[in-house]
Amino acid sequence: MSKQSALLSAPSSSLLLEVVDGALVIQHWGAPLSGDLASAQSAIRPSIANSSWDVPQFPGIMRESSRGFLGRPSVSGHRNGKAWSTKFEVSNFHHVGNHVAITFTDFHAQLEVVITFDLDVHGVLQQRATLKNFGDGDYSLNEYIHWLPLPKEATQTLDFAGRCKQLLLCEV
């Protein structure tokens, strides 16, 4: 797979997305990045501590046990007791301006996730996701979790979860 990345920029913030080993990784979300994309990617690459992996590990935005993530997975469910562990791979990457649409596919679980990111001129990031079952049988979805890294400076999160667009403001 060729290296795919996208830089979404606003005067107050930037979002740098990169496909690493088939997973979508948020390399940077915070202060504006300047210069070329290659320099930015090189500058934000984490260092490797002694007695650690040989290369930095990036579990990706889709938290999955198949990629070594030990917490709650992004997609929790099963297909009649099977396909309970997913491994989504980026199958389509579309970037135009400050909009990115990424399609993830797990052919074993027969699921597809489309996640879009939009960064407006004020630096507000909007993320949307849809999950599609393209298999013949039913898929029992227990939970789908959106995940975004928060910068150290963050003191509040704003969540418009659910269909009724209720406002939920949480102190971090």
Located regions from the model:
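Polysaccharide-binding surfaces and accessory modules of carbohydrate-active proteins
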Residues: 4-7, 13-15, 25-172
